[in-house]
Amino acid sequence: MTPPTTGLPAENTTDDNDHLVQSDDPEHPANLIPSLCAKFWTLGWVTGTGGGASIRDDDLVYLAPSGVQKELMKPSDIYVLSLAAQAQSLSRRQRVYLRSPPVYKPSQCTPLFLAAFTKRNAGCCIHTHSHWAVLVTLILEQQGSKEFRINNIEQIKGFGKGFQKSGNLGYHDTLVIPVIENTAHEEDLTEFLEEAMDKYPDTYAVLVRRHGVYVWGDNVHKAKTQCESLDYLFQLAVEMKQLGLPWITDIEPTIPTRKD
């Protein structure tokens, strides 16, 4: 095997570790990422090469590249790095790639994806530029708020209770998603994302003001379904705001009386 390639994020390098992204299994990360991104493109989540996704398979991390049209992505476009080698890197901005495509640049989302893997042991992290997510951050900006909070909505059940906790949130629970401010360069968001993770240990997502959202999960299924649920709630919240409806309500639980 060719030794790992070490370089700065902007560096393009090539090696012969193409076997890492070659598989007939549709569930292989190198096949899943293009498939997922093509679906996300139809939803408007990764328009104009924005957004991306990353999947961790044990120590191997598979990443969508920068600058690629997400609906046209191929397995051969995928970067692969070693999580352990990255943790041992002397520089947080230095990457240890096992496999690099010859054309594209590594995604600036990479350190944010790595934060989800190292701090939450996530199996997948998704970054979208959903306009519903952006609109929610603008509404919160007007309110001077750094949290998205909503309760008493059925779709809240689509979220886990938190890191290393079993079960999902309930209908009457309050979903809380922190908001961090955007930066001129994506990589510079990393420390603020990590701070939000520390402050909100149970969150599965972080909103980025005027930018989008990062969502992660224990595996691809959970990350995808939580991202879908969150986008549903963002759209609902924007439309509720237009109708003058509150996101937080005090509703008495309905208790069934039948005993059979």
Swiss-Prot record:
Catalytic reactions of this protein: 5-(methylsulfanyl)-D-ribulose 1-phosphate = 5-methylsulfanyl-2,3-dioxopentyl phosphate + H2O
EC nos: 4.2.1.109
Entry's cofactor comment: Binds 1 zinc ion per subunit.
Compartments, record wording: Cytoplasm
GO molecular function: methylthioribulose 1-phosphate dehydratase activity; zinc ion binding
Active site (UniProt): E154 (proton donor/acceptor)
Protein task: Catalyzes the dehydration of methylthioribulose-1-phosphate (MTRu-1-P) into 2,3-diketo-5-methylthiopentyl-1-phosphate (DK-MTP-1-P).
Enzyme class: lyase
Keyword annotations: Amino-acid biosynthesis, Cytoplasm, Lyase, Metal-binding, Methionine biosynthesis, Zinc
UniProt: substrate binding residues: C109
Location (main, coarse): cytoplasm
Name the UniProt record assigns to this protein: Methylthioribulose-1-phosphate dehydratase
Start and end residues of each stretch annotated as Disordered: 1-26
Organism field: Podospora anserina (strain S / ATCC MYA-4624 / DSM 980 / FGSC 10383) (Pleurage anserina)
Keyword Ubl conjugation listed: no
Compositionally skewed regions (Basic and acidic residues) per UniProt: 16-26
Pathway of action: Amino-acid biosynthesis; L-methionine biosynthesis via salvage pathway; L-methionine from S-methyl-5-thio-alpha-D-ribose 1-phosphate: step 2/6
A GO cellular component entry from the record: cytoplasm
Family listed: Belongs to the aldolase class II family. MtnB subfamily.
